[in-house]
């Protein structure tokens, strides 16, 4: 490799590092409250259409429930809802806006959730995913969720729910 090629390669790497540093400083993850239920409903309506507006509103009042969002430039691009009961947690909702998928935001949000579970001494984290959602299945496997069961004809389209579990070692 000549000096010019080496210089250009290093310049490109520096630009990439600088861009990533600026970009990650624009990302935040925080618990949100009932004032933002409309934004949750909008994200859900644009992605997996899981809950009605009324269901979203009620999520914020359930005991042991947290609604957490990942924000890019202070705009919500993803959400999870988790309910904790003693030493178990159930993910009842996890989604990233379509145009922000496969860019690492879901992984950042899941990592945040897992760290939160570890702080709370959760022994297992549970979720269900449609058998037709192979991308989500791969995503959850990346975080060591194992298939532990199935609910037949669970979703409106007749597909089964695949039950997943992640155990935390103490």
Functional labels for PLM-detected ranges:
Residues 97-111, 120, 124, 130-138, ...:
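Conserved glycine-rich acetyl-CoA-binding loop
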Residues 63, 136-137, 159-160:
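Short Asp/Glu-rich motifs
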Residues 92, 118, 135, 157-158:
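Short secondary-structure boundary/hinge segments and terminal tails
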Residues 2-24, 160-170:
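Terminal substrate-recognition subdomain of acyl/acetyltransferases
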Residues 23, 27, 31-99, 110-112, ...:
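Acetyl-CoA-dependent GNAT
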Residues 59, 132, 155:
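Positions that flank functional sites
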Residues 7, 128, 141-162:
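Conserved catalytic-core motifs of GNAT/GCN5-like acyltransferases
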């Amino acid at each position: 490799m000549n000096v010019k090629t080496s210089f250009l390669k290093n310049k490109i790497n520096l630009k990439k590092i600088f861009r990533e540093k600026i970009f990650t400083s624009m990302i935040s993850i925080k618990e949100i409250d009932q004032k933002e239920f409309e934004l949750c409903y909008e994200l859900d309506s644009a992605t997996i259409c899981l809950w009605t507006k009324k269901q979203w509103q009620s999520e914020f009042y359930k005991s042991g429930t947290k609604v957490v969002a990942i924000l890019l430039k202070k705009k919500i691009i993803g959400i999870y809802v988790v309910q904790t009961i003693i030493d178990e947690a159930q993910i009842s909702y996890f989604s990233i806006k379509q145009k922000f998928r496969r860019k690492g935001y879901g992984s950042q949000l899941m990592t945040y959730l897992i760290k939160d579970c570890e702080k709370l001494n959760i022994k297992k984290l549970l979720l269900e995913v449609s058998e037709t959602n192979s991308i989500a299945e791969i995503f959850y496997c990346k975080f060591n969720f194992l298939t532990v069961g199935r609910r037949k004809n669970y979703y409106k389209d007749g597909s089964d729910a695949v039950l997943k579990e992640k155990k935390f070692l103490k």
